[in-house]
Amino acid sequence: VNNIQGRQAERARFGYLGGYVGRLVPVLLVVISLSLVCNRTASLQNQNQAPPPPPTLGLEQGLLEFDTPDFKLKLVKASQTVAALQPKTAPGFDFTPSDRLERRASNGFYHLGDITLRVRTDKTGPWQELDTAKARQPVISLPTSGRVLASADLTPTLPANSPVQITRSWVVDNGQLSLQFEIKNKTSSGVEIGALGLPMIFNNFITGRNLKESHELCSFFDPYIGEDAGYLQVTRLNGHGPALIVVPDRNASFEAYQLLNEPMRPNQTFEGSFQWMVHSQAYADAEWKNAQPWITPTHLEILPGASKVYSIKFLLSDEIRNIEKTLIANQRPVAVGIPGYVLPMDLDAQLFLNYSPQVSSVVAEPAGSIIVKKEKPTRNGWQAYTLRGKTWGRARLSLTYKDGTRQTINYYVTKPETQAVADLGNFLFTKQWFEDSKDPFGRSPSVMSYDRDAEKIVSQDSRVWIAGLGDEGGSGSWLAAAVKQFGQPKREEIQKFERFIDEVLWGGLQYKDGPNKYGVRKSLFYYSPTDLPNHVYDPSLNWTTWTSWKKPDAEGIGRGYNYPHVVAAYWSFYRLARNYSNLIKNHPWEWYLEQGYQTTKFTFSRAPNGRRRVGYVDLGLMEGDIFLAVLSDLKREGWTEKAQEIEKLMKERADRWRQEAFPFGSEMAWDSTGQEEVYAWCKYFGYDDKAKVSLDSIIGYMPTLPHWGYNGNARRYWDFLYGGKLRRIERQLHHYGSGLNAIPALAAYRETPDDFYLLQIGYGGTMGALTNIDQDGFASVAFHSFPSTLKWDGYSGDYGPNFFGHAFNTATYVINHQEFGWQAFGGNVKLDGDWVRVEPLDSFRMRVYVAPAGLWLTLDSGTFSEIAINRRTHVVRVGLSPANEYTSDARLRVEQPARISGVAQYRPRRQLIVERDAYKIPLTKTVTVIELGTK
């Protein structure tokens, strides 16, 4: 809460205070104790902070300062842990939290250079914990020479009965900074190392900083848990270079990634401190025994009198996009997956490996889960493989190179995309379909939140919005149901959703009359036993916290984030009613577009007194691209005055953002939600400089890594508290940040198709949203990343915005990469003479991007069956699927968002009617082929 004080006064005008409480606690416009607000926030997380113990780090003894080719390194003299790690190419910037040293100087706080172990001398006995941060004493400085900057015996920091002696050295090795540990067995018997962790402490401390300070000073770090090929990348929040890459050097295989237990517990402005696990068997046998690890756990025995050296190196990349190039330049193994690391079973995926030793073996686990076929190397020697997923779920490839280097790549095998989405729709409209005419909250009929563990609808939760069709945690399921129909309509499902619109949404969740007409309630469910004396609230739930809104609170209309969900539902059904025959029967298309327009207008307009009706609308909203979609369709329909009205409202917001350094404010102190809509409107109004700030921010928190869970995974770590069953602060793998942030990433790629990095992260996020869908169609809110868990959450929660991002983005991208040649993200490629033939296999098959031509083909109705590109003439042939009972015409839009030298405007080579900026193409009982050319 305390780092957004600059916004609190503004938000209080809407009846909210900042931070978590802005999202969840309505308040009167009176003086309210901020301490009470903070206490309520902390009570949800159960993370009230105790005062730190006395300092033991030894800062009063001063610092040691060193100059390396890449860094200015400062060590605390007494501990020889890092006080600062400053890249020379970014004066004034520090990857470590040097400005928080005094606050983190007590026992229990970790610093770069610490080490943790579990050891034993009896192979069946208990593990002994060794931890250099637990009880600090000044280390014993050792003489140095040559390339060694500093060296110390860590014995004073270890228990007196430690069976090992640890020597730590800071070394410059071939011009690169290295951290080395020598572990020596002091005993007369073997010492087993069951766990060895290297704390990775970098500046992710957003607490107490405003957005500008956070983006300029802070970094996020993402692990590639990949054994010897693994690494940790540390990237600045502003998305600019340089980026730090921590890589294994000697014996430091990256096996697991663990949250450290520090006095300052994780919260919304501090994700926590983590350690790189080199060995983890002792945890795998105990705390992690119920989890399926990313890597097979290891342990090691050190014989009497023997020593083992572990070391890591610190590399510097000039920018985030060049991390892979930096790894290659430093002879590190690099993997590039196309389309990523999610494998639909009908897709031929590609894997390219850059490492000078050849691969000696490739093993898929579970056996047969992935079929691997070796291909010819690329022209510059990348080793190439074609992959086909065979067994649904998590899988991994374990690679061994001829020099003994090991690499693991974790994949997720899904059903074919169209089948996965069909399963999602079926589950939503059967298992999650709620019908109870006696429901006192007016939720029937609807698609409601679901508990997969209990196999039942969540009809009650003390976080009332989850059971009340509100917020993201309660709206998620019906939102996913709506946008699923947009791209994969099914009449039986549409009939049910029409009932939801007429019986629950319009007039229930959304007011249909009175002064709040078009306002969206925060929740239909609420906790008010006095209002409902005959309703039995589950006594096992805690109804005493601020999350259990009373009826007046639930009826509030002030949370702007609730409105895009409603607009998305109306817009999806407008598109269906307008472009298909006999799918939508309860209202004409005009009604749906009018509802989308009126809801948008209400969201952003002001009351007669000049105040906002709805809070947070000066911020970027999740799914905010939907408002641009409504505006575009208002224009196409010739509803000019209404379009101008919406445009005026949006320009007021964009003009405001243009004046802000980092216009990504949120109901949270830092968030990854506003960038999507800020990018869209800044591009629309020509504020390209501010759009670039948005895109750079996304690049800062949305990595590409050889791992299905982290590739394209936009950073989110607190929403298990609000939409999950297992409630805690934890990095969420493929929460809705993945799908939503992929929208601007891919939009930017379509304008700059030579920026392969944007395609990697954008498509990774788009595909990530499919992994949430299980074999029966249930979609989880997100995957738990802690090594003790590593499983999907039991609640459906706020998956809906994630699927919105997928639905808004899903497409087949055809590229001609300078190294990898012709490839397709979301389809299969076949070379046939002069022709490159692509079978689209994405979820909807309604969008194709041909990168060499900068050509963006989209369908308002119909689907693509094939795209063929002539490499000599550059003609593009479009194959359209046969007509069906709902689709007699395809409506094709031809756009060229990228300006590519030598490429003229594409248009159909036969005369076609144009309606609403789309070519109307009559379909037949067989595939219809349309040829596009520039002449």
Where in this protein do the model-derived segments appear?
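Bacterial N-terminal signal peptides
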Residues: 24-36
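Extended acidic/polar, glycine-enriched regions
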Residues: 357, 361-423
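Short Pro-Gly-centered flexible turn/kink motifs
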Residues: 70, 300-318, 924-931
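Low-complexity, acidic Ser/Thr/Pro/Gly-rich terminal tails and inter-domain linkers that flank the onset
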Residues: 154-173, 319-336
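Catalytic domains of carbohydrate-active enzymes that cleave complex glycans
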Residues: 309-311, 439-487, 499-934
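Acidic-aromatic substrate-binding/catalytic surfaces of carbohydrate-active enzymes
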Residues: 54, 59-160, 207-283
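Acidic (Asp/Glu-rich), glycine- and aromatic
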Residues: 78, 159-166, 171-230, 405, ...
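Low-complexity, Pro/Ser/Thr- and charge-rich linker/hinge segments at domain boundaries
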Residues: 206-210, 325-346, 407-449
